[in-house]
């Protein structure tokens, strides 16, 4: 029996809906208008309502929104819509996915598997990659997530802007704005956001043949010989010099060294930020590391007794504090709804949008708004309109 999964990726593209089962239903009767922060939102027509599996529901609505702001482009970068007129309704194309908090259903932050870095891919490619790497799980739906280095100008190109934790793998422990975590615990506390994201020092995890962690050890320093009883990490890392990408190459000493030359994934983010996982390929050899490769050099007798060729190891900074119970964490933007009310808008321009929120019972709400296509009645939203939308669909908090 296949399990069910709701998946998030970090690419900024349109919502992908998989498995549509029921024809559209048109709404009749009194119009329900949701208002907050000077913005208003209502559904003009329900185009589709699709009941997926495990209580997951997708709806596509033709909607209208307004704001008490004025003067900015009504269609964002599509100037054909003129400027926003305060309190005038503009048409919107909205997709909403509701995911009940329950066992057997997960929200996963997934990036394309790349041993040495980050790779551009479509949502469909990401969904296929997830299923390939996680046999038995089925992707039901996918939605865009965090922003990322879309032009590939960073030292390690195409990284996400914020935190990336995927099924407990802390791929990128660097926060930007908001950080959104998913507990996947089946309770009303399905989402953690608006907290201080924290990680501990780098840690080495040693796995047994069943993929279970049997021991963990602190990493004391980087790219230098360890003192007695200590363990250090060696890795080559990229950096920018006057906009030019360069690498600081490291050479592993032969004594007390255990090197992974074919990592499952090796992400060198800076001189003191690294994630790596893979089986030990070489023991006790001097070697110049290429980007993504890494080595453990240790004078800890307990650790040395566990390390050998083909032993699976992982280097990461474990999540601590408020997000410690979240197995999937993603970077986000601002707070839209807090304690059931619209909250502090800061962006007063219309764009295509992606949102996530939580209902009081733990149900997660994912929403997208199309934009920059005035001729198709897709104007996009500014933040106060987004808040009205998320309140309309029952969220007590949203981001």
Predicted regions, residues:
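A short, flexible low-complexity segment enriched in Lys/Arg and Gly/Pro that occurs
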Residues: 8, 108-125, 371-388
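A generic structural signal for well-ordered coil/turn residues at beta-strand boundaries
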Residues: 12, 93, 176, 330-332, ...
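Zymogen propeptides
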Residues: 25-276, 281-291
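Acidic, glycine-rich loop-and-beta core segments that form the ion-binding/anion-interacting portion
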Residues: 282-284, 292-298, 307
């Amino acid at each position: 029996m296949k399990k069910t999964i709701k998946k998030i990726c970090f690419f900024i593209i349109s919502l992908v809906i998989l498995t549509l089962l029921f024809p559209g239903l048109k709404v009749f009767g009194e119009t329900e208008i949701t208002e907050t922060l000077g913005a208003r939102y209502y559904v003009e027509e329900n185009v589709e309502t699709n009941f997926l599996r495990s209580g997951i529901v997708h709806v596509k609505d033709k909607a209208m929104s307004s704001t008490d702001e004025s003067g900015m482009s009504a269609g964002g970068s599509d100037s054909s819509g003129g400027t926003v007129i305060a309190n005038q309704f503009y048409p919107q194309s909205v997709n909403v996915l509701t995911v009940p908090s329950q066992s057997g259903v997960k929200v996963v932050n997934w990036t394309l598997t790349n041993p040495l870095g980050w790779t551009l891919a479509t949502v469909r490619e990401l969904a296929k990659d997830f299923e390939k790497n996680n046999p038995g799980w089925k992707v039901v739906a996918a939605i865009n997530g965090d922003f990322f280095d879309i032009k590939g100008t960073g030292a390690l190109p195409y990284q996400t802007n914020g935190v990336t934790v995927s099924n407990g793998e802390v791929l990128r422990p660097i926060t930007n704005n908001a950080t959104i975590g998913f507990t996947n615990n089946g309770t009303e506390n399905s989402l953690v956001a608006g907290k201080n994201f924290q990680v501990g020092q780098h840690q080495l995890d040693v796995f047994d043949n069943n993929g279970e962690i049997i021991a963990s050890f602190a990493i004391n320093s980087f790219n230098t010989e360890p003192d007695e009883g200590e363990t250090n990490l060696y890795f080559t890392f990229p950096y920018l010099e006057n906009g030019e990408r360069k690498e600081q190459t490291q050479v592993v000493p032969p004594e007390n060294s255990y090197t992974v030359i074919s990592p499952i994934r090796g992400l060198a983010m800076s001189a003191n930020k690294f994630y790596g996982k893979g089986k030990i390929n070489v023991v006790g050899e001097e070697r110049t590391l290429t980007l993504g490769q890494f080595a453990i050099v240790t004078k800890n007798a307990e650790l040395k007794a566990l390390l050998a060729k083909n032993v699976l190891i992982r280097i990461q900074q474990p999540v601590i504090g408020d997000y410690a119970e979240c197995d999937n964490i993603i970077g986000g933007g601002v707070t839209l709804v807090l304690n059931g009310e619209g909250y502090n808008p800061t962006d007063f321009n219309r764009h295509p949008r992606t949102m996530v929120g939580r209902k009081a019972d733990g149900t997660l709400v994912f929403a997208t708004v199309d934009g920059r296509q005035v001729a198709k009645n897709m104007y996009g939203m500014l933040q106060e309109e987004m808040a009205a939308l998320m309140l309309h669909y029952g969220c007590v908090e949203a981001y």
